[in-house]
Amino acid sequence: MELDDGTADAALLAAPGRSLLIFTSAGCATCRLARQVLPAATLPVERLYWVDAERSGGLVQRYGVFHLPALFLVRDGDFLGPVQAPLREPALVAAILTAAEREPEELP
């Protein structure tokens, strides 16, 4: 599902379980790879949310996105922080599970 500055907060606050928020842009080769790899991977999340960084400058600023793709974990409306891993399923699973153990915070 695609989110933007106007829809992200409501969607993330209402979504039960784990959500992976993924910032990408059309001109980013690694982002195109992420759009292929992530939906096909078996990840410990209930859903993937995509944000076009070029169209959602407010979210980019609030989440402190500097490099794309940028991945963040949200659980039951709480922010668990960035997920930093290569775009390979085992590494992503491990990074998501590590992020899931963090102390939850309010969404940025």
Where are these regions (language model features)?
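N-terminal leader/targeting and pre-domain segments
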Residues: 1-18, 101-108
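Structural micro-motif
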Residues: 63-72
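Local sequence-structure signature of Cys/Sec-based thiol-disulfide redox active-site neighborhoods
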Residues: 7-41
